[in-house]
Amino acid sequence: MNIWIRGGTSDANNISKEIKRNFKDSFLILTTTTDFGGKIAENFADLVISEKMTYDNLKKTLLDKKIDVFIDATHPFATHASETGIKISKELNIPYIRYERPSEKFKNAFYVENYEEAAKLALKISKKNIFYMSGIKNLKNVSEIIPIEKLIVRILPTSVPEALKILPSKNIVAMQGVFSENLNKELIIDYNCDVIITKDSGKSGGLYEKVSGATLAGAKPIIIKRPEINYPLKFEKIVEIVNYLKNV
């Protein structure tokens, strides 16, 4: 069985590990969008492709590799990747499986639909600084709403050059996560923040530690909801994927 796993997440690596354990003769191709993710993925797959693939390139590769099953284990907010995977799988008549990391609701958090709404709400309820913990991608948009002097951001070290175009270095925390509850708490306190902005990235994205750390620091968590996508087939447990593959 030739299996394509679209990843770049720890979820994808864990899925690959379990598939190889249960299906010794399977051929696993795991994709990531960065070389860093690719190096990690090499431990779990037969072939790793570390590049952003165009629609046509992805379609051709799926055909060339004679893929039997397409597993989407991308980040919950990687909507374009998921929608592309669904469309191509349908065109090629390849079974599509979505692994969706479980979501958890927090009673003390504010939930919003998008980054603009999050930034506006944060500005409204904050009397101190605002800690943005949702990556580099939407930082520019958020910085156009929240005054730069109030905005603290935590990003990957590789994103620092881009962040410096938006914020001064004293407002940038460059670290590779996932982070503990205590570290989150201490950072929020040290940077004098009373609100955090994050997204519903689930347990493997460190959401619980962010929210609990914020609560201990006396800060209000604002969580951006996951986008809604109509997946053809979705599982929240890796064992469910393994069981499905046994019947393919």
From Swiss-Prot:
Disulfide bonds: none
PANTHER family, A to Z: COBALT-PRECORRIN-6A REDUCTASE
Species of the source: Methanococcus maripaludis
Function: Catalyzes the reduction of the macrocycle of cobalt-precorrin-6A to cobalt-precorrin-6B.
Protein name, per record: Cobalt-precorrin-6A reductase
Cross-referenced InterPro entries: Precorrin-6x_reduct (IPR003723)
GO aspect biological process, one term: cobalamin biosynthetic process
A Pfam family the protein falls into: CbiJ
